[in-house]
Every structure is written in structure tokens, then in C-alpha cells.
């Protein structure tokens, strides 16, 4: 965590409610759709700091700063689905209670990323005097989600706004890539990194939701959900809800069919072909499986790469193999021909097989 400007006690302002509380008619981040069809990512979003599934050290620190009336400007960064937005919204609910709507300005910087937003909406909101009506704190809050999508000019303009309105407003910036935030903004905020969630936390939260919804999920299905989420709670919930809509019983196979990812047994079969069969046989078999199961070559590459770590082979062969697989995945990201890259994949393993045979002798 990097240091911030000295956090001073929050000052109490008085006067009119802030303008621009809703951004151009957009629903705020915290609005939760009603009804049974509500996305589970919103239905089960933590409502208080105590409900946040992980990162207890960060949450406890922010909670303590809030209780001591010393909340600084915040910069929360890390991969998607790790609780950044939920944490800030929980802080805002704790601070403002029923006055939440009047005291916080929520903007998604990926949609509203220009300098005009800083000069108009944020400047107007921060400069307006607020009347707390008994809220615990009367300092206002500006929440900028996906702040790394803001233009550099907008970030420099925001720096000046933060300096000018520190006594009356706290700014909370949320982003995935902290290197896209200018140093001048970073130095004015206290930084917290939200790492991908541990599989244990994802599993426990999923168990709670499965029980609440009365779902039929076996152990294989739950393990598949945790594995495919890669520490992203939002992704895990979306996969769970999608699979539930497609299948009454949520099994490992149902989860993989819903997401289109290759199953572990498919990867084992593909690895067997790559390590044992001829070029033509491997090409035909993998192509047939891709067509039959609707698999994407890039997903196969990623899973095969992880499988390579489990195979016994000389270190130099493994290093070259992983490097070649990374090159193939890179080329696929530029929409290169799938058949050509499948051929490159098989050729890479053919070379690795030759190197392993030579090393054995």
C-alpha cells in the first residue's frame, strides 16, 4: 500500500443537496434489480463490511478508518470480481444510512471517461454544500469505478478537484490496472490491492448461495465452479446462475457444457494425442473434438499449458514448450487462422517429444 495525503477528520458542511447524483439517467452501481430474475451477483452482493467474503485485513483497516472518522481517499485495484466495488458500497451504506442517495456520486469511468465529466458532474457534486439530516458523517463520497479507463487529461483534471475539495469530499477510485492511473492520483490516495479470491472463500460463498436458492449441486459441479472462476466471485456466480437455468442438476459436465470450456478428461485425451500420435492423427482427432463439442482453440491452449506442468520432462524442454504455447495463444488473440495454429500446437509437441527422446538417450 502506498501512502496518501494526511487524512484529516471529516468536516461537517451544511446547505443544499448535491446536484448530479444520478449520471445522465444511468442506474447507480448499487441499484439492485427486484424480482426473482435479479442477477445473483446483485442479489447476493455484500450489504455490509462484515459480509465481504475475503480480504479481511483490508476490510478491517477500512472499517477502522471509518469508525475513527479518518477515511482517506481510496484507490482499490485488482482483478475483476474480488470485492472492490462491494467494499466501497458497504462503506458508503455504513457512513450515510438512509441518506446514501444524497451523499454519494457513482460514476463508471469506462462510459464517462472524458474531462467534461470531471469539470461538470464531479466538480459540481464536490463543490455543492451538503445537509446530512443526521447521517453519521456529512462528508460526501465520489465513487469512480473502472477509473483506469479515464483519459490522462481527465485524470489530471481530477487531481486538482481532489486537492480542492478534500475537506468536504472523499474520492474512491476502483480499477483493474493500477499502472494506468497517473502517479499524481496514486499519491493522493491510500492504495489497497484486492488479490484473486482464494478457492476456499469462493467455495464457502457458493455453498451459502446454493443453500439459499435450494440448488442441486454435486461435489464435482462445485469444484468445477471454483476452478473456472479463477478467484473471480462475479464469474462464479454468473456461471452458477447460467448453469442452473440450463440444467436442474448442476454437475461437472453441466458446468463445462454451459461455459464451453474443455473438460479435464477432454484435455487429458488431447494431451495423449499430442504426446503419442502422429501429426495427421492428432490434427484429425483434435479437429473432430473441437467441432463436436464446440471448443475454442484458445481454451484448449490454456488448459494444455496447465497440463504441461504435471508432465515429467526435462526443464529445458518444458521451458521451450511453454514459451511456444504462449506464442500460439498470442497469435490467436489477433484472430489468426485456427487450423494453422492447431498445426503449430501439434508441431510444438512433436518437437518436445523429439527432445525428450534425445534427452533420455
Swiss-Prot record:
Pfam family, one: AAA
Known tissue expression: Expressed in roots, leaves, shoot apical meristem (SAM), flag leaves and panicles.
Induction behaviour: Down-regulated by sucrose starvation.
Annotated segments matching region Disordered: 1-39
Protein name, entry field: Replication factor C subunit 3
Source organism of the structure: Oryza sativa subsp. japonica
Signal peptide residue numbers: none
Tree of life domain: Eukaryota
Described purpose of this protein according to its UniProt entry: May be involved in DNA replication and thus regulate cell proliferation.
GO BP terms in the entry: DNA repair; DNA-templated DNA replication; negative regulation of defense response
Subunit (UniProt): Heterotetramer of subunits RFC2, RFC3, RFC4 and RFC5 that can form a complex with RFC1.
Gene: RFC3
Compartment annotation: Nucleus
Listed InterPro entries: AAA+_ATPase (IPR003593), ATPase_AAA_core (IPR003959), DNA_pol3_clamp-load_cplx_C (IPR008921), DNA_Rep/Repair_Clamp_Loader (IPR050238), P-loop_NTPase (IPR027417), Rep_factorC_C (IPR013748), RFC_lid (IPR047854)
GO cellular component, as recorded: DNA replication factor C complex; nucleus
UniProt record similarity statement: Belongs to the activator 1 small subunits family.
Predominant location: nucleus
Keywords recorded for this protein, A-Z: ATP-binding, DNA replication, Nucleotide-binding, Nucleus
Amino acid at each position: 500500500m502506498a501512502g496518501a495525503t494526511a487524512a484529516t477528520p471529516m468536516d461537517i458542511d451544511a446547505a443544499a443537496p448535491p446536484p448530479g447524483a444520478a449520471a445522465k439517467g444511468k442506474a447507480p452501481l448499487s441499484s439492485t434489480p427486484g424480482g426473482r430474475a435479479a442477477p445473483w451477483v446483485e442479489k447476493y452482493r455484500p450489504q455490509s463490511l462484515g459480509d465481504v467474503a475475503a480480504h479481511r485485513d483490508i476490510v478491517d483497516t477500512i472499517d477502522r478508518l471509518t469508525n475513527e472518522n479518518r477515511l482517506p481517499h481510496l484507490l482499490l485495484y485488482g482483478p475483476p470480481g474480488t470485492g472492490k466495488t462491494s467494499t466501497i458500497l458497504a462503506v458508503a451504506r455504513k457512513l450515510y444510512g438512509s441518506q446514501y442517495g444524497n451523499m454519494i456520486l457513482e460514476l463508471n469511468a469506462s462510459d464517462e471517461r472524458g474531462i467534461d465529466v470531471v469539470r461538470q458532474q464531479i466538480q459540481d457534486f464536490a463543490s455543492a454544500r451538503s445537509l446530512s439530516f443526521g447521517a453519521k458523517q456529512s462528508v460526501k463520497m465520489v465513487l469512480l469505478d473502472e477509473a483506469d479507463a479515464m483519459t490522462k487529461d481527465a485524470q489530471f483534471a481530477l487531481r486538482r478537484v481532489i486537492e480542492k475539495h478534500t475537506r468536504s469530499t472523499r474520492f474512491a477510485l476502483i480499477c483493474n490496472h493500477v499502472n494506468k492511473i497517473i502517479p499524481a492520483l496514486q499519491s493522493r490516495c491510500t492504495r489497497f490491492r484486492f488479490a484473486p479470491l482464494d478457492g476456499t472463500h469462493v467455495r464457502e460463498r457458493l455453498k451459502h448461495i446454493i443453500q439459499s436458492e435450494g440448488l442441486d449441486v454435486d461435489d464435482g459441479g462445485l469444484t468445477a465452479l471454483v476452478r473456472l472462476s479463477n478467484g473471480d466471485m462475479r464469474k462464479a456466480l454468473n456461471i452458477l446462475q447460467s448453469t442452473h437455468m440450463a440444467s436442474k442438476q448442476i454437475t461437472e459436465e453441466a458446468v463445462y457444457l454451459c461455459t464451453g470450456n474443455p473438460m479435464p478428461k477432454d484435455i487429458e485425451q488431447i494431451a495423449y494425442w499430442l504426446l503419442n500420435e502422429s501429426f495427421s492423427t492428432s490434427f484429425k482427432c483434435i479437429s473432430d473434438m473441437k467441432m463436436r463439442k464446440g471448443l475454442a482453440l484458445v481454451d484448449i491452449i490454456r488448459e494444455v499449458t496447465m497440463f504441461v506442468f504435471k508432465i515429467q520432462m526435462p526443464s529445458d524442454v518444458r521451458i521451450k514448450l511453454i514459451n511456444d504455447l504462449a506464442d500460439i495463444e498470442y497469435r490467436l488473440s489477433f484472430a489468426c487462422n485456427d487450423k494453422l495454429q492447431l498445426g503449430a500446437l501439434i508441431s510444438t509437441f512433436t518437437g518436445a517429444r523429439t527432445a525428450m527422446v534425445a534427452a533420455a538417450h
